[in-house]
A protein has these predicted regions:
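ATP/NTP phosphate-donor binding region
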Residues: 1-86, 90, 127-142, 153-163
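A residue-level signal for conserved active-site and pocket-lining positions in enzyme catalytic cores
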Residues: 33, 88, 92, 114, ...
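Short glycine-rich anion-binding loops that position phosphate/pyrophosphate groups of nucleotides
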Residues: 35, 93-95, 118, 205-207
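Short glycine/serine/threonine-rich phosphate/pyrophosphate-binding segments
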Residues: 39-40, 94-100, 208-213
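Catalytic core of DAGKc-family lipid kinases
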Residues: 118-197
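ATP/nucleoside-binding phosphotransfer catalytic cores, i.e., glycine-rich phosphate-binding loops
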Residues: 171, 187-190, 236-339
Length: 339
């Protein structure tokens, strides 16, 4: 008997997030990318803003310890999941991915403040942090639920690893230089054999990440589907396909000297020949809160520099580079200023 229930029954059993009311938020958790130079001051600004709104503040334990935000109670990520009504993440998309996965089962809404580079998920800039958050707490906001994937590694008749992914699940050749042979099935249908560097299974959120670099489609977050994108396939006719989220994708490693699976590029597991990776929609989702007026297409246009001439894009890139510390001494100086 298969260790997994039919895909349809799993889809029907997904939890439905309760309606979110900002007026009910009494306690907010703060998580920061604490190893980033200069992040201490924005975190202190954020905490002061929340206290000024009459909101209790909890600071994630590692953030509290390393940034010395000891004026506020500290809590682990799991504790934030049970104690906080809302969590604000200050960092880049990588930080947001990690926090989202850890809090997904708790159903805690998240707001992202961008202290990184692109900021697809952390869409509020530091310069407008207080203004944007004031609008949110005044009720001028947009809420959206983003899907997650769950990927299980089956070896023989045992599930050896299971984890969630917000962006993507990647099965690839690991550290070995040769290709890997994979067999792909969707539901009960055999699809194809692939000889390639790997394959990306991307959520709509992840469609603007690794998948886009591998020529996968950009999928709007409201579309209940994910993309299956081959990485450098040997046969040029192997193309990306979009799969409905009620399906189950099974990828079997049929031949490989070395192979691995990666969840959001942050956790991984080695694979051997015969291993099956079973991917399906997770029973939980990530709830993102944006200021009113958030526009996905405007975000794409801004982040991906659509409608800009090549010359203006080059100038923008040069300005970004000029603001980036170019050596250890400059980074050290930034850290001293932040302290």
């Amino acid at each position: 008997m298969s260790p997994h229930p039919p895909a349809q029954s799993r889809t029907q059993s997904r939890t439905q997030a309760a309606p979110f009311a900002i007026a009910n938020v009494r306690r907010v958790g703060i998580v920061g990318r604490y190893n980033t130079p200069g992040i201490a001051q924005p975190l202190k600004r954020l905490a002061a803003f929340l206290v000024g709104r009459g909101i209790d503040v909890l600071v994630e334990a590692d953030t509290s310890s390393l940034i010395r935000l000891r004026s506020y109670p500290a809590a682990t990520i799991d504790e934030l999941g049970t104690l906080a009504d809302l969590v604000i993440v200050v960092g880049g998309d990588g930080t947001m991915l990690s926090v989202s996965r850890q809090l997904a089962m708790h159903g805690i809404p998240l707001i992202g403040i961008n202290q990184g580079r692109l900021g697809f998920l952390t869409d509020i800039g530091l310069a407008e942090m207080e203004t944007a958050l004031a609008a949110v707490f005044d009720g001028r906001l947009t809420v959206e639920d983003r899907m997650l994937l769950r990927a299980d590694v089956i070896r023989g008749d045992q599930t050896v690893t299971s984890s969630l992914a917000f962006n993507d699940v990647v099965v690839n050749r690991g550290g070995f230089g040769g290709m890997v042979d994979l067999s792909v099935a969707i539901g009960s249908s055999y699809v194809c054999d692939l000889r390639c560097d790997g394959v990306i299974i991307a959520t709509p959120t992840g469609s603007t990440a690794y998948s886009m670099s591998a020529h996968g489609p950009i999928v709007h977050p409201s579309v209940r589907a994910w993309s299956l994108v081959p990485i450098s396939p040997h046969a040029l006719t192997n193309r990306p396909i979009v799969v409905g989220d009620s399906e189950r994708v099974t990828i079997t490693v049929t031949r490989a000297r070395e192979a691995a699976i990666h969840w959001d590029g942050q956790t991984q597991q080695g694979l051997v020949e015969g291993d099956c990776v079973v991917i399906e929609a997770a029973p939980c989702s990530v709830r993102l809160v944006h200021p009113e007026g958030y526009d996905y297409y405007a975000m794409l246009r801004k982040k991906l520099h659509w409608s800009e001439s090549p010359l203006s894009m080059d100038r923008s890139s040069r300005r970004t580079e000029s603001r980036t510390p170019r050596n250890k001494q400059e980074r050290k100086s930034d850290g001293q200023k932040a302290a």
